[in-house]
Amino acid sequence: MKFALAGNPNSGKTTLFNALTGSTAHVGNWPGVTVDKKEGVYKKLSEKIYIVDLPGIYSLSPYSPEEVVSRNFLLNEKPDLIINIIDATNLERNLYLTTQLLELDTPIVIALNMIDSV
């Protein structure tokens, strides 16, 4: 199975990726840290789950090379599940992408992040 971590820039995707895979991918408190997809494996179940950390996007209409990477993965590689990481401090901006992801007919889980800052 393959799960994709998708969300706006600087929403906590790579932090969740590191927690799930045991990786040490670079994180930063600014957008644009992840510029290409990263892949890791969640091994705590009998079945391996491949986790893909995608660069941050605001919509499925890309404006930068990083956004093209994310959009192409979501549309062409068809993950089994999308985990949409949402920054709770800016729900309106984040939910625009969520509405687009829901239209892909891929199962989606919403992970509300940064709730302690609200």
Which stretches of residues belong to each language-model region?
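Conserved G1/Walker A P-loop phosphate-binding module
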Residues: 1-65, 75-77, 81, 103
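Conserved C-terminal guanine-recognition region of P-loop GTPase G domains, centered on the G4
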Residues: 40-46, 69-118
